[in-house]
Amino acid sequence: MFTQTMPDKRWNVFEVKLDGSGFKQLIHNEEPDLEFYDGTYLPDGRIIANSNIGYQGVPCVSGDDPVGNMVLYTPDTKNLRRLTFDQDANWNPVVMNNGRVMYTRWEYTDLTHYYSRIVMNMNPDGTEQKALYGSGSMFPNSTFDIQPLPGHGSAFVGIISGHHGIARSGRLIVFDPAKARKGAAGMVQEIPYRNRPIVEEIKAVSYTHLRAHETRHDL
C-alpha cells in the first residue's frame, strides 16, 4: 500500500503486488475535493487513512498547509467516516500488536509547547484516543514513522526530530511505553548504537521566519 497522485492531481491510496501486478486504487469517494494518504489496513479489511476531510490549514502558516485527519473506509460499501477532529495534522496510522491503532499527532495545545508531535493510540473505530508517548514532555519534540516491534507487547520504533529542519529526518529510537511515557526514560535504545545512554536535547533557539507576504521574527 502506498500513496500517489491520481490523473486529476489528487492524492489517494493505492496497492500493488510485489511483482508489480494488481495495481489498483483503494479508496473511492465522489467528493471532488477529498484527498487521502498514509493508509493502513485493519485486520478486518477496512482501511484507515489520513485525509484533508476537515478542509482546514495549519494556523501558524496562515492556513497555507493542509491539515490531515484520519478517516475509516469500508471498501465493500465505500462508507467513509471521520475518526479524528484535530486542529493540526495526524500522521502514519499503524495497527499495534494489541489491535489498537497508534499514530503521530501534532498537539497544538499540549502542556509544554505548541509544536509537539506526540504518539497517540486509539481503537480502530476512533474511540478512546489517548497519548501513548511524549505528552507533556519537551523531549522528544517530534516522533515520526512509528512502527510496532513484532512480537512485543508495547515497544515500537520511530524517528525523533525537531520542529523545523529536514522533514522527518533524525534519530532512530526504540521506545517502550511500559517503562516510561515521557522524555528519554522510555527510550530503550538508539539505533545503530548499543549500550549508549540517550541524553535529552533541549535548546532555546531564535530564528527568522520569512514568507513572501510576511516579515516577522519568531522565538
For each of these PLM feature ranges, what is it?
Residues 6-11, 60-66, 111-115, 165-169:
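Short, solvent-exposed loop/turn segments at conserved positions within beta-propeller repeat blades
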Residues 14-19, 66-75, 116-125, 171-180:
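Beta-propeller blade signature
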Residues 1-3, 47-51, 101-104, 155-159:
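Residue position within the beta-strands of beta-propeller blades
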Residues 208-215:
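Conserved small/polar residues in nucleotide/adenosyl-binding loops
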Residues 9, 35-37, 66, 89, ...:
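Beta-rich catalytic cores
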Residues 42-43, 96-97, 150-152:
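Residue-level detector of Asp-centered blade-edge/turn motifs that repeat once per structural unit
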Residues 27-31, 83-87, 133-138:
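Surface loop/turn motifs at the tips and blade-to-blade linkers of beta-strand repeat domains
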